[in-house]
């Protein structure tokens, strides 16, 4: 079934300029709707770890993008205090008490998750925003004013602190989603964008900004890398001097590495203070 869906969506993507809410083949509409339904349930996801490596299913990202071409904006009620006008309804628009109980997560007013995002059991959504195509795994906390961007992949037992920004892939269009692996802590007001991967058991301090062009400096080895935080890293904001010493530019600094056992035993503040 997935292979057939992929074929229909890949073909529709090549002809997307011809699609509109009033002009789209029935099989394309059905394929896109089914793909979004499966994303919403967590049966499919835009990226998944296979044999230790992350695989991105580009066709599912295409399905999300195609859905914007196939739907008109429409008024959406907002509990009597306002209205919204958009193409994508709330994930919880038609939820009953039984649906919430089966989902096993908490949604604190006025948290918003768009339909096509997946929220796993024991997740807590404080007043925050989770975009279409995102996957938020079990036991994760999405704290107040945090945003989980389109198609972002958030692992188990992750803490996204207040005001954290996890970038999406739709605007501007990105090749790969941001991935935060299991048991990571992302400090307040930090930003992770442009398909950066933060590997498991890592701690990102408050106010760290990570994109594909951000230098990641390993204090222990002196190496500079881009786009990936290694497992068990403790990362703080820093600066690297220019070659001529005339100025310095922002970077992220890996101040130490810890294993899962140490991470579990030692408080976050103690890890971040470092020597």
UniProtKB/Swiss-Prot annotation:
Family: Belongs to the transferase hexapeptide repeat family.
Single annotated GO MF: nucleotidyltransferase activity
Coiled-coil regions listed in the entry: none
Catalysis performed (reactions): (S)-2,3,4,5-tetrahydrodipicolinate + succinyl-CoA + H2O = (S)-2-succinylamino-6-oxoheptanedioate + CoA
TM spans (from-to): none
PANTHER family xref list: 2,3,4,5-TETRAHYDROPYRIDINE-2,6-DICARBOXYLATE N-SUCCINYLTRANSFERASE (PTHR19136:SF52), MOLYBDENUM COFACTOR GUANYLYLTRANSFERASE (PTHR19136)
Entry keyword set: Acyltransferase, Amino-acid biosynthesis, Cytoplasm, Diaminopimelate biosynthesis, Lysine biosynthesis, Repeat, Transferase
Pathway given in the UniProt record: Amino-acid biosynthesis; L-lysine biosynthesis via DAP pathway; LL-2,6-diaminopimelate from (S)-tetrahydrodipicolinate (succinylase route): step 1/3
The protein, known as: 2,3,4,5-tetrahydropyridine-2,6-dicarboxylate N-succinyltransferase
Amino acids binding substrate: 106, 143
GO cellular component: cytoplasm
Enzyme class: transferase
PROSITE patterns: HEXAPEP_TRANSFERASES (PS00101)
Source superkingdom: Bacteria
Localization per record: Cytoplasm
Known EC number: 2.3.1.117
Major location (coarse): cytoplasm
Oligomer status and interactors: Homotrimer.
GO BP annotations listed: diaminopimelate biosynthetic process; lysine biosynthetic process via diaminopimelate
């Amino acid at each position: 079934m997935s292979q057939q869906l992929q074929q229909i969506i890949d073909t529709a993507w090549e002809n997307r300029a011809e699609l509109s809410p009033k002009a789209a083949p029935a099989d394309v509409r059905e394929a896109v709707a089914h793909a979004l339904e499966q994303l919403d349930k967590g049966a499919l996801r835009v990226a998944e770890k296979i044999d230790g490596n992350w695989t991105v299913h580009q066709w599912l990202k295409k399905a999300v993008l195609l859905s914007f071409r196939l739907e008109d904006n429409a008024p959406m009620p907002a509990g009597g205090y306002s209205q919204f006008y958009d193409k994508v309804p709330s994930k919880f628009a038609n939820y009953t008490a039984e649906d919430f109980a089966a989902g096993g997560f908490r949604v604190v007013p006025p948290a918003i998750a768009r339909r096509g995002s997946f929220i796993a059991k024991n997740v807590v959504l404080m007043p925050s925003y989770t975009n279409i195509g995102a996957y938020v795994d079990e036991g994760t906390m999405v704290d107040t004013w945090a945003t989980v961007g389109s198609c972002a992949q958030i692992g188990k037992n992750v803490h996204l602190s207040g005001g954290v920004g996890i970038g999406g892939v739709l605007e501007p269009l990105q090749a790969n989603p941001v991935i935060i692996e299991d048991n990571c802590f992302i400090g307040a007001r930090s930003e992770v964008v442009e398909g950066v991967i933060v590997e498991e058991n890592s701690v990102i301090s408050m106010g760290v900004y990570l994109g594909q062009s951000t230098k990641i400096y390993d204090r222990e080895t002196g190496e500079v890398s881009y786009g990936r935080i290694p497992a068990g890293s403790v990362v703080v904001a820093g600066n690297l001097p220019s070659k001529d010493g005339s100025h310095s530019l922002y970077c992220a600094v890996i101040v130490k590495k810890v294993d899962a056992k140490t991470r579990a035993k030692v408080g976050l503040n103690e890890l971040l203070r470092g020597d």
